[in-house]
C-alpha cells in the first residue's frame, strides 16, 4: 500500500493553487484535525495508475474534514495566491462548503453520518469521522480517502480492488433505496469509465426499481413522490448531458432492465436513441424527451417536478403529434408558409418543435427548417412602410404584413 500512498501524494502535490500544501499548513495550525481527499478525483488518479487511462485536468476536488468545513475554506481563501477569483458558498444543511477558484470547484464537507428515514428523501445528518463519512458514499470506488497528515489510505470496502477489476459495486444493501439517483450515476460510470456493474449490485438495482414508485405521503388519495428524488435524478441527467454520452447511459440503463426509474413507457430502440442524439444537438430539453410518450403524463410530470410551462410543451407535443398522424396526406403538400402558419398560430414553443423533430418521420425536415430558417424571415415591408402606402393601422395591416412575410418564406424555398 506504501507505493500507492507515495503515488497519490505525488499526484496530489500537483493540485492547482498549491492546495495540498495549504491543507498541510492548516493541519499544522489546527492540531488533531484530520483532512482527507476523497471522491472522483482520487478515484481517477487510481484508474490512471492501474489502467493507464488519462483524464482531463480536475475541475472538481472533494475534501472531507473532521472539523469545521467553513474554517478550512476561509483559511484557503485567505492564503491562496495568484488567483483571479475565489468565492465561498456555504450549505448549512449538510455542513458543506463550495469554493470556486477561477475555473475550479473545491467541495469541503464536514465528516458526517446520514440516516434515510424513507427511500428517496433527504437524510438526517450528524457529525462523524472520516471512516463513518465513507459509509454514506455510493460505490466502493468512490469510498477511498487519503488523509493528508498521516498519508493514510482509507479503503474500508475494497474500492482499490474494484478499480483494478473495473467493477462497480454498491456500498451496501440499501444503497439504491436510500438514493435511487445512484442508478443513474452507476450507468454514468459504466459508460465513462468502461466499468461493469457487479452481479449483486445489478440485482439490488433491479429489485429496488420493481418497487418504484416509492411513496412519501398521500394527500386526498393522490400519490406524492419524494421531491428530493426527482430533483436529484434530473440533476444527474443534466450533468450527464453536459459531460457524458447520454445515449450510451440510457442504453446501459435499458440493458440493466431498470429504465422504469425514468419512464416505464420508454421504448429504447434505434429511433428513440437517434432522437436522444438529436435532442442534444438541438440543445433541447432532454428530460421532456424522456417523458414525452408517457401514458400517464400527470404522474410522470409529478415524479420529476416538471413545471407548468414544461407541461404545456408536452401537452402541445402530444396534441400536434396526433394531428400530424391523422392528416398525413394534407401535411405532405404543405408549403413552407403553411408550416409556419401551422406552428405559429398554435403558438408552439421551440421545445415542442424540437421534440417533434426528434420523432423523425416525414415532417422533421419541414419543422427543422422552420426552427432555424423560416421563423427568422420577415416581411420586406413593416408597419411604417405600409402606413406611407395608405394602410391604416389595425388587423388588416397585420394580415398584410403576414401575407408578405409568407411570400418571402415561399420565395426562399423556391430559390
Walk through the language-model features, giving the residues of each.
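Catalytic cores of the polymerase beta-like nucleotidyltransferase superfamily
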Residues: 1-415
Amino acid at each position: 500500500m506504501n507505493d500507492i500512498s507515495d503515488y497519490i501524494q505525488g499526484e496530489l502535490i500537483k493540485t492547482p493553487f498549491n492546495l495540498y500544501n495549504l491543507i498541510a499548513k492548516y493541519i499544522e495550525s489546527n492540531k488533531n484535525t484530520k483532512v482527507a481527499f476523497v471522491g472522483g478525483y482520487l478515484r481517477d488518479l487510481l484508474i490512471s495508475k492501474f489502467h493507464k487511462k488519462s483524464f482531463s485536468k480536475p475541475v472538481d476536488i472533494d475534501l472531507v474534514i473532521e472539523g469545521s468545513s467553513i474554517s478550512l475554506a476561509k483559511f484557503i481563501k485567505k492564503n491562496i495566491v495568484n488567483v483571479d477569483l475565489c468565492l465561498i458558498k456555504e450549505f448549512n444543511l449538510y455542513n458543506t462548503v463550495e469554493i470556486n477558484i477561477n475555473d475550479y470547484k473545491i467541495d469541503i464537507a464536514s465528516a458526517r453520518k446520514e440516516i434515510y428515514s424513507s427511500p428517496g428523501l433527504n437524510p438526517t445528518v450528524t457529525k462523524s469521522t472520516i471512516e463513518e463519512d465513507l459509509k454514506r458514499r455510493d460505490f466502493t470506488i468512490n469510498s477511498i480517502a487519503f488523509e493528508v497528515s498521516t498519508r493514510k489510505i482509507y479503503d474500508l470496502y475494497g474500492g482499490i480492488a474494484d478499480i483494478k477489476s473495473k467493477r462497480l459495486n454498491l456500498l451496501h444493501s440499501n444503497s439504491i433505496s436510500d438514493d435511487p439517483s445512484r442508478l443513474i450515476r452507476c450507468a454514468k460510470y459504466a459508460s465513462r469509465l468502461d466499468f461493469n456493474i457487479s452481479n449483486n449490485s445489478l440485482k439490488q438495482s433491479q429489485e429496488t426499481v420493481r418497487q418504484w414508485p416509492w411513496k412519501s405521503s398521500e394527500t386526498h388519495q393522490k400519490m406524492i413522490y419524494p421531491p428530493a428524488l426527482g430533483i436529484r435524478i434530473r440533476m444527474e441527467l443534466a450533468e450527464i448531458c453536459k459531460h457524458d454520452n447520454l445515449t450510451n447511459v440510457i442504453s446501459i440503463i435499458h440493458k440493466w432492465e431498470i429504465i422504469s426509474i425514468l419512464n416505464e413507457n420508454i421504448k429504447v430502440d434505434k429511433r428513440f436513441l437517434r432522437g436522444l442524439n438529436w435532442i442534444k444537438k438541438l440543445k433541447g430539453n432532454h428530460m421532456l424527451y424522456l417523458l414525452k410518450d408517457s401514458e400517464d403524463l400527470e404522474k410522470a410530470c409529478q415524479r420529476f417536478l416538471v413545471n407548468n410551462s414544461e407541461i404545456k410543451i408536452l401537452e402541445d407535443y402530444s396534441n400536434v403529434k396526433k394531428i400530424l398522424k391523422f392528416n398525413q396526406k394534407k401535411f405532405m403538400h404543405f408549403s413552407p408558409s403553411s408550416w409556419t402558419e401551422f406552428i405559429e398560430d398554435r403558438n408552439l414553443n421551440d421545445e415542442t418543435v424540437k421534440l417533434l423533430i426528434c420523432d423523425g418521420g416525414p415532417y422533421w425536415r419541414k419543422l427543422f427548417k422552420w426552427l432555424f430558417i423560416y421563423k427568422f424571415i420577415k416581411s420586406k415591408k413593416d408597419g411604417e412602410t405600409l402606413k406611407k402606402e395608405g394602410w391604416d393601422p389595425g388587423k388588416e395591416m397585420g394580415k398584410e404584413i403576414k401575407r408578405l412575410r409568407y411570400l418571402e418564406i415561399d420565395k426562399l424555398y423556391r430559390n
